[in-house]
């Protein structure tokens, strides 16, 4: 098949219309998933078995099954139950958009909860004991000592999870959501030019995730001033040392 720059450009422009919907799914599902993940992480570190076990089961279930299966269960499976169809949540569950968002949020919550748990457990026990010795209450200790350090530790893993969620929005096309991949599938059915269309879609996802990665790099730069200072001071010292040598 001959190379056709005009077709590639037209395809790229057509796929751009799917970006807002893809970003909506990614942003809202990550936000909802983060809230749920925080609760799950607290349950995991609570040292109370009746809180820890349900959180463990939830995380195991959603990490151990494919996201596509979860989307199908929510969109196709729940509608099989009459009680669900007559409940107040049915107006949402019969809409593919909300089903996709729910599946994405529930899935990312399981992964993010473990990232948060690792961040919470990374805070040195000595600092916690010192804060208690200074008379800090549990809430103040958590807010002033634990949370700031946990955020910095979990940020690299969390950024990877956000990037994965941006890519995972492509699975929403399997339940008729016309985001980037959904529009790509429609264009392929009309033109039969699979390679060109999916190459354009892949380029758009690559650009989006590059932007997300850079935003998290800037956030890490802002939250980790000692790394910034080390980077600014290390190079001049090394060059000076080489001159004296």
Curated annotation (Swiss-Prot):
GO aspect biological process, one term: amino acid transport
Keyword terms of this UniProt record: Cell inner membrane, Cell membrane, Membrane, Plasmid, Transmembrane, Transmembrane helix, Transport
CDD domains reported in the protein's UniProt record: TM_PBP2 (cd06261)
Protein location: Cell inner membrane
Chief place where the protein resides: membrane
Record-linked PROSITE patterns: ABC_TM1
Topology class, membrane: Multi-pass membrane protein
Reported induction: By octopine.
Annotated TM spans: 12-32, 57-77, 96-116, 163-183, 204-224
Domain ABC transmembrane type-1: start-end pairs: 19-216
Gene Ontology annotations for the cellular component aspect, listed alphabetically: ATP-binding cassette (ABC) transporter complex
GO molecular-function terms, A-Z: transmembrane transporter activity
Function text: Component of the octopine active transport system probably consisting of four subunits: Q, M, P and T.
Family (UniProt): Belongs to the binding-protein-dependent transport system permease family. HisMQ subfamily.
PANTHER family: ARGININE ABC TRANSPORTER PERMEASE PROTEIN ARTM, MEMBRANE COMPONENT OF AMINO ACID ABC TRANSPORTER
Protein name: Octopine transport system permease protein OccM
Organism: Rhizobium radiobacter (Agrobacterium tumefaciens)
């Amino acid at each position: 098949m001959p190379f056709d720059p005009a077709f590639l450009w037209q395809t790229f422009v057509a796929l751009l219309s799917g970006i807002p919907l893809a970003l909506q799914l990614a942003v809202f599902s990550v936000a909802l998933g983060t809230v749920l993940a925080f609760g799950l992480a607290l349950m995991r570190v609570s040292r109370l078995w009746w809180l820890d076990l349900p959180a463990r089961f939830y995380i195991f279930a959603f990490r151990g099954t494919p996201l596509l299966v979860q989307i199908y269960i929510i969109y196709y499976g729940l509608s099989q139950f009459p009680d669900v169809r007559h409940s107040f949540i049915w107006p949402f569950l019969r809409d593919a958009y909300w089903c996709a968002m729910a599946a994405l949020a529930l899935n990312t919550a399981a992964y993010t909860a473990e990232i948060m748990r690792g961040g919470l457990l990374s805070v040195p026990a000595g600092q916690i004991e010192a804060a208690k010795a200074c008379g800090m209450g549990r809430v103040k200790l958590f807010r002033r000592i634990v949370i700031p350090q946990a955020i910095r530790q979990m940020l690299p893993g969390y950024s990877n999870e956000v990037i994965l969620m941006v890519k995972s929005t492509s699975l929403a096309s399997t339940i008729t959501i016309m985001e980037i991949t959904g529009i790509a599938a429609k264009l392929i059915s009309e033109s039969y030019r699979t390679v060109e269309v999916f190459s354009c879609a892949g380029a758009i996802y690559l650009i989006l995730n590059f932007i997300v990665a850079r935003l998290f790099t800037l956030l890490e730069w802002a939250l980790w001033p000692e790394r910034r200072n080390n980077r600014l001071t290390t190079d001049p010292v090394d060059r000076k040392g080489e001159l004296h040598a």
